[in-house]
From Swiss-Prot:
InterPro entries: CusB_D23, MFP_Efflux, RND_pump_MFP. Induction: Repressed by BepR. It comes from the Bacteria. This is Efflux pump periplasmic linker BepD. It comes from Brucella suis biovar 1 (strain 1330).
Amino acid sequence: MTLNRTIRCFAAGAAFIVFAAQPALAQAPGGATPPPPQVFVVDIKPHDVPVTYEYAARINAYRNVQVRARVGGILLHRNFVEGTQVKAGEVLFEIDPAPYQAELEKAQAQVAQAEAQYQQSIRDAERAEQLVQQKVQSAAVRDSAFATRDLNKAAVAAAKAQLRTAELNLSYTKVTAPISGITSQEQVNEGSLIGTDASSSLLTSVTQLDPVYVNFSFTDTEAAEIAKLRAERGATGEDADRLKIKILFGDGKAYDHEGTIDFTSSSLDTETGTLGVRAVVENPNHRLIPGQFVRAEILDIQVKDAITVPKAALMQSAQGQFVYVVNKDNVVEVRPVTGARELKNDWLISQGLNSGDRVITEGVIKAVPGRPVQPVVQGVDDKAQAEAGKEQAADKK
């Protein structure tokens, strides 16, 4: 229990002690009845309340892509400075192209050879057809010529496919950046023999840092609350699907750019009982770094027609939370309530209070359930009301 809560509980207890002592205090010296004690109250008026949901969050890269060799050979050159920005398509590494250039030339020759054979088979098939028409040659010889022509046509297609493969392999000797981002350290030194298997093909990685992801988690209760508030927001025509977040650093300073929640998990984590959430935020100056811990605060969430009371008004007993309410006869009543959420200066009350109720905020120690008080509405010319209360008390004497 906090110090303020302890004080409020003590105040509540003291009020009951005063109540027990009322018969002894009923008559002041000289037989005059003392005036009811003066207390400050707030009039309960439902209003829209912004609610803050704040979570521990972690920064993750928007994309982190491994750069791997797609052909083997000797690594000739590294064309970038480690840890610097590169653009998508920029050549990062060069692998010895000589063997792949030779394979390309071989494939080109095979295409030419296949084309020549195909053209010859076309001519042979045409002559065979003419001889059959002249009844000089059998149909079987003609059919064989047609089959040879079709086989040579397929051979041309296969040779061209080999040529495309050779062209691709030669192009793969220039390893380019798949995305724009920051490079990591090289994994293989120049002059090394590299392969295409998982253990030897990794050359470096590129990390995209603008934008970045902010990952955090809701509890199941908070997820339900936010879903309800988003539904209410959507019912009023507001955009309920794009919740904004503010990012706070460890020193309490806010990041320059707001983020937008773009993903919410469809199921709870069975180990933590939380719902994974992800937001995306601009990071043009790379102020946010993958792995960095921050605080994420959800913005623009409001509870419609909410009831709040100052923190000083809410007290705790063994039976639960309660406040002191002044009824229409200016008599103090104990009102059990349910505090839904602690705000900056107030408590959001989910049950127990209604519009128009007057809740005691100051002078609780003087308030006794079942006894009258002089209520002064807090924040509405307190001094004038206090003077008016004194005059009313004087008139009763």
